[in-house]
Amino acid sequence: IFGNNDKEAKEQVKQMISKNVDIQVVDLYNLARMENEIDFIILTSDIIMQDKFISKAGTNLILLWAKDHHIPVLVLSDSRKILNTKILPTSIIDSFVKEAPKSKSDIWKGAPEEVTITNYHLEEVKNEEINFFILEQQAYPPNELSQVVDKILVSKFI
């Protein structure tokens, strides 16, 4: 599941195909239609932290649907996206994590002024909602990921 501009997800799909993995791409609007054909869902992340990650808006809706239908969810990413929130000041973390609202006209051009429009492209997701995080060398359940985040970043800063 990815949007039209999700270049990273499209590249990951190409890599998985090169490893003979069968992939079927479904947009968010057709997810329920494909329920009986989905073995698992693979998502991307923009940032991975100890207890949450940043992903595309709509990810929490996908997770609710997947949980209700007993479909495992994986996050495919790499260690360059890890941000250790324990060793950085809040101001630096906020510069990576906080997102300014996007253009209201992306949702409704010429909307009446009385209408409040909220448009964000990213959202925070709790790591505990994911079955496995797949990094370059290994897959980690959420309860192990926090330790991995600490080790990877400490070694990068030394």
Which role fits each region the language model picked out?
Residues 4-158:
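Conserved phosphate- and dinucleotide-binding cores of soluble alpha/beta proteins
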